Amino acid sequence: MKKAAFLDRDGVINVDRGYVGKIEDFSWCDGVFEGLLRLKELGFELVIITNQSGIARGYYSEADFKSLTKWMLTGLEKQGISVLKVYHCPHAPELGCECRKPKPGMILKAASELEIDLKNSILIGDKDSDIAAGLSAGVGANFKLGKDFASLKEVAFSLKIK
């Protein structure tokens, strides 16, 4: 079984400007490439899990999201970074679906589909809902950006893996 780094997208991979669904709205967070490369060096597979209620709200389409995701993954690949898979929840919060964080649906689906060992995995997010999803799914270590860490890069370089 693999160990993974579950990563929120908005606020971790890219600057969160609210409902980032199009390429022109996307800006990489500082240090993201170095941080992701470090996670790969430590043996983590990268899995992105992202709430995208902007789709349900009509701010952008599923096609816009897929186009942006393809562009983002290409940008990461140019830096030598491969992402195992991107999971997203397109639903509005009031729907009460199982995939939207803080529920653990996306993480549990990834663990099942990709044969991930949750206890030896980590999650990096910027919201309480990210951390709640990780805790509920049984992810071994959960890191919230803001209070203790300013960036994904800081988290990645603070990890001590045996």
PLM features per residue range, with description:
Residues V12-D16, N51-S53, K85-H88, K109-A111:
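A short alpha-helix capping/helix-coil boundary motif
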Residues L7-R9, T50, G125-D126:
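Active-site flanking residues adjacent to catalytic metal/cofactor-binding acidic residues
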Residues I13-N14, S53-R57, P93-L95, D130-I131:
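Short, active-site-adjacent cap segments at secondary-structure transitions
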